[in-house]
């Protein structure tokens, strides 16, 4: 990632102090700033890009101020047209007692996608975790991405 300072406000992680007196120490070279990251627990590994990357995202579960609590769900990526937000589709079966059969149903969910997950494509299976409301429609954060298999456009139950 080239330059993170593209916004009007200075982009920085709030927990990292950047105003160290380097003149007194005699250091003149550009050194890499320390980076804040955390282990979110629940058996999910922190991505390498979250540890070594330079992106700033306050809504990222690994480098931001968001805690994962509540439900852990999975779904298939259907749309990627928003910035740092994707739409996933969750398929399920609903039982109809009169006909003694099941019908297919689905729900779409808006989910925050951290920049540490770089190569996410439509059709990939993502695992998401519940967090505090991040916007009007977003209440979940991507925790893991599994690449799509060869078959597409079929009903998948999670």
From Swiss-Prot:
PROSITE patterns given in the database record: RIBOSOMAL_S17 (PS00056)
PTM-bearing positions, type Citrulline: 22
Residues where lipid is bound covalently (S-palmitoyl cysteine): 60
InterPro entries in alphabetical order: NA-bd_OB-fold (IPR012340), Ribosomal_uS17 (IPR000266), Ribosomal_uS17_arc/euk (IPR028333), Ribosomal_uS17_CS (IPR019979), Ribosomal_uS17_N (IPR032440)
Outcome when changing residue 60 to S: Abolishes S-acylation
Keyword Aminoacyl-tRNA synthetase carried by entry: no
Keyword Signal: no
Annotated positions of the N-acetylalanine modification: 2
CDD domains cross-referenced by the UniProt entry: Ribosomal_uS17 (cd00364)
Coiled-coil region: none
Keywords: Acetylation, Citrullination, Cytoplasm, Lipoprotein, Methylation, Nucleus, Palmitate, Phosphoprotein, Ribonucleoprotein, Ribosomal protein, RNA-binding, rRNA-binding
Compartments it resides in: Cytoplasm; Nucleus, Nucleolus
GO biological process terms, semicolon-separated: cytoplasmic translation; ribosomal small subunit biogenesis; translation
GO molecular function, a single term: RNA binding
Residue numbers of Omega-N-methylarginine PTMs: 69
Post-translational modification: Citrullinated by PADI4.
PTM sites of type Phosphoserine: 67, 110
Residues bearing the modification N6-acetyllysine: 38, 45, 58
Main location: cytoplasm
Quaternary state and interactors: Component of the small ribosomal subunit. Part of the small subunit (SSU) processome, composed of more than 70 proteins and the RNA chaperone small nucleolar RNA (snoRNA) U3.
Family: Belongs to the universal ribosomal protein uS17 family.
Summary of the function given for this chain in its UniProt record: Component of the small ribosomal subunit. The ribosome is a large ribonucleoprotein complex responsible for the synthesis of proteins in the cell. Part of the small subunit (SSU) processome, first precursor of the small eukaryotic ribosomal subunit. During the assembly of the SSU processome in the nucleolus, many ribosome biogenesis factors, an RNA chaperone and ribosomal proteins associate with the nascent pre-rRNA and work in concert to generate RNA folding, modifications, rearrangements and cleavage as well as targeted degradation of pre-ribosomal RNA by the RNA exosome.
Protein name (database record): Small ribosomal subunit protein uS17
